[in-house]
Amino acid sequence: EEVRDAYIAQPHNCVYHCFRDSYCNDLCIKHGAESGECKWFTSSGNACWCVKLPKSEPIKVPGKCH
């Protein structure tokens, strides 16, 4: 399966906000990624970034979280 590095998304194009790398690492691995970290996302906070996340998993795309 193809993979990519990206911000993993919840339903409705919303990111997973975070404070700790360990939270994102566990979340990303649970969704099939190699690893994850808590990265700067916008001025409103940080979000989980996954490394080698399977293409079948949703990622943050341009547009609002709704």
Curated annotation (Swiss-Prot):
Which additional comment does the entry carry? Negative results: shows very weak activity on Nav1.2/SCN2A, Nav1.3/SCN3A, and Nav1.7/SCN9A voltage-gated sodium channels. The complete amino acid sequence was obtained by combining proteomic and transcriptomic techniques.
For this UniProt entry, what is the primary localization, expressed as one broad class?
A: secreted
Look up the record and give one Gene Ontology term from the biological process aspect. Answer: defense response
Q: What is this protein called?
A: Delta-buthitoxin-Hj1a
Q: Where in the cell is it found?
A: Secreted
Q: Which Gene3D superfamilies match?
A: Knottin, scorpion toxin-like
Q: Identify the tissues in which this protein is expressed.
A: Expressed by the venom gland.
List, alphabetically, the GO terms of the cellular component aspect. Answer: extracellular region
Q: Please explain the role this protein plays, according to its UniProt record.
A: This recombinant toxin slows fast inactivation on Nav1.1/SCN1A (EC(50)=17 nM), Nav1.4/SN4A (EC(50)=7.5 nM), Nav1.5/SCN5A (EC(50)=9.2 nM) and Nav1.6/SCN8A (EC(50)=37.3 nM) voltage-gated sodium channels. On Nav1.1/SCN1A channel, it acts as an agonist by inducing a shift in both the voltage dependence of channel inactivation (alpha-toxin activity) and activation (beta-toxin activity). In vivo, shows moderate insecticidal activities. It induces irreversible paralysis in blowflies and lethal effects in D.melanogaster.
Q: Which UniProt keywords are listed?
A: Disulfide bond, Ion channel impairing toxin, Neurotoxin, Pharmaceutical, Secreted, Toxin, Voltage-gated sodium channel impairing toxin
In the UniProt record, does the keyword Protein biosynthesis occur?
no
